[in-house]
Regions:
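Hydrophobic faces of well-ordered beta-strands that scaffold small-molecule active sites
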Residues: 97-103, 126-130, 164-167, 182-186, ...
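Catalytic beta/alpha-barrel core
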Residues: 6, 145, 161-172, 182-195, ...
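Alpha-helix-loop-beta-strand connector modules within alpha/beta enzyme cores
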Residues: 142-166, 200-206, 256-270, 316-339
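Catalytic alpha/beta core domains of metabolic enzymes, predominantly
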Residues: 203-303
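Glycine-rich, proline-tolerant flexible connector loops at the mouths of alpha/beta enzymes
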Residues: 129-147, 305-315
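Active-site mouth loops of central-metabolism enzymes
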Residues: 8, 97-115, 138-143, 163-167, ...
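N-terminal small/glycine-rich loop or linker at the start of catalytic domains
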Residues: 83-105, 134-139, 263-272
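N-terminal amphipathic alpha-helix/helix-capping segment at the start of soluble metabolic enzymes
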Residues: 67-100, 337-343
Length: 349
């Protein structure tokens, strides 16, 4: 349950409520908002009558969350969560959509990575993405350079100022990845790796959580709940496509409807990944447009300096000239949505 305190509730009022909740075995999370202090009480509500809390000094009202993802629920927090970085970049709410671009895997050619990063920075992108540890279906496929790739990403950040997004696959690598990355990505295959979710929940880094290829929206939000429950509220959701019976023309089925559904159910920001969502280079632009129109807070796109020689996912990667053209058109569309129609990309109700 959620206890919303009065505007003029004192510190003593708040402490009295939290002490009572703790006595009855609740896990208590206190949020000090601009107007009201909100107390999340996680536990068995049958152990304590809500009427007892409601009668306490300083309590304005009590709300009960309908969905099992209590912390991620819009019922708990009506305002959009906005994740702000030290360089001023903001993800979520009515802020301009962000772009996370880069190769599927960081390769030995650092100059190629820097070429992509430099172009992305010049265009106005905010994040450089690239895999250091890659989960591959086949054991014979390239599975990443490990720490060497992380060093390349960090070096590119130094030269361009872009924030680094990279995937964490194993709890054992958490400290290593955190040393280099600005944002930790939990990939689709690990969406229900609960030990990993618990670990990233205890670190102080923003997390991009990708939807599993066969996961429902409820399962997706419950995965985010694991991260939130363990203390990390800096979660960015990512729709990246579902497995489908029809994989002849697309690698996955990109669930565009998930964006407005999640915007309604949750306060967390959500981005789209049309590269993995379709697996086809020519579909990246139209599906990115579709995602932005329905409210996505950003787009993740695979960009390679030479897709024909990419060690992984070249077929779904844009070249730098292609990305420049796509980015320019997407930016024009974003401007139109904001200025001509007075819309906000966050799809507020």
């Amino acid at each position: 349950m959620i206890i919303i305190m009065e505007r003029d509730a004192t510190a003593e009022n708040i402490k009295a409520v939290t002490d009572l909740l703790n006595e009855h075995g609740f896990r208590v999370i206190v949020h000090e908002g601009d107007v009201h202090t909100v107390i999340d009480a996680l536990g068995d509500k049958t152990t304590l009558s809500p009427n007892r809390i409601d009668a306490m000094d300083g309590v304005m009202k009590i709300k009960f969350i309908r969905e099992p993802f209590r912390l991620a629920s819009r019922d708990r927090k009506s305002d959009d969560t906005i994740i702000e970085f030290s360089n001023g970049v903001k993800v979520g709410g009515a802020n301009r959509p962000v772009f996370m671009v880069g190769p599927c895997s960081v390769e030995e050619d650092y100059e190629g990575l820097l070429e992509v990063a430099t172009a992305a920075k010049e265009l106005g992108c905010q994040f450089l993405r690239g895999g250091a540890f890659k989960p591959r279906t086949s054991p014979y496929d390239f599975d990443g350079l490990g720490e060497k790739a992380l060093k390349y990403l960090a070096q590119a950040r130094e030269e361009t100022g872009l924030l680094v997004v990279t995937e964490l696959m194993d709890v054992e690598d958490l400290d290593l990845v955190c040393d280099y990355a600005d944002v930790i990505q939990v990939g689709a295959r690990n969406m229900q790796n609960f030990r990993l979710l618990k670990a990233v929940g205890k670190c102080n880094k923003p997390v991009v959580l990708k939807r599993g290829p066969a996961s429902t929206i409820r399962e997706f939000l419950l995965a985010a709940e694991h991260i939130l429950y363990n203390g990390n509220e800096q979660v960015i959701l990512c729709e990246r496509g579902l497995k489908s019976f029809d994989n002849v023309f697309t690698r996955n089925l990109m669930d565009i409807s998930a964006v407005p559904v999640i915007k309604k159910l949750s306060h967390l920001p959500i981005i789209v990944d049309p590269s993995h969502g379709t697996g086809q280079r020519y579909l990246i632009e139209p599906m990115a447009k579709a995602g932005l129109v329905v409210g996505a807070d950003g787009v993740m796109v695979e960009v390679h300096h030479n897709p024909a020689t990419a060690l992984s996912d070249g077929k779904q990667s844009l070249s730098i000239p292609q990305f420049k053209e796509v980015f320019t058109r997407l930016n024009k569309m974003i401007d139109t949505l904001h200025l001509e129609h007075g819309m906000t990309i966050s799809n507020e109700e």
